[in-house]
Amino acid sequence: YTHIRFDILITEETLDLIESQIDVAFRITAKVSDSLIARPLLQVHSVLCAHPHYLEALPKIVHPDQLIQYACITHHSMQNTWTLSTQEQEPQNYPIRIVAQSNDAHALHQMCRNKMGIAMLPYAIVKDDLENRTLIEVLSNYEAPQMTLSAVYSSRRHLPKKTQEFIAFVIEHLKK
């Protein structure tokens, strides 16, 4: 597709696709606006993690009720709670003490690596750090809610063929 020109805008803000003249957006969210079409692409699993040096001077965290005693780094869309569950327990909101927020997951990742506190981050972003023990998983027996990465667009009726082909390409690529 050498004739296709990309204009890529990277933001974690929810923009009006029509007003911003965006053909397709990729969003990680539990739900999109009813006025948009969302094509689910994959599930995004998040984990709680922290730098080992941040945790070493603190009491061992064994239950989410303790999160309020720790510095927490969170996405700006989160309230003052994190929702966690186990196999035996329904999702429950636990209060957290927010010391830093960002609308960018990579910025949150760097804050976590810089020993600023505990963060809830997509596993795909922290996988290498967890394997290398640069970061360690916290409360590993608890799960964060699954989010969905979706291709989001305004209407099938007016979706340009090149956009349809691009979405099909992304879907095919993610299957590999």
Regions flagged by a language model, labelled:
Residues F26, H109, K127, Y153, ...:
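A cross-family signal for key residues in well-ordered alpha-helices
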Residues L15, E19, K31-Q146, K176:
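C-terminal regulatory
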Residues L139-K176:
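A late-sequence structural motif
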Residues Y1-D34:
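Central regulatory/effector-binding core of bacterial HTH transcription factors
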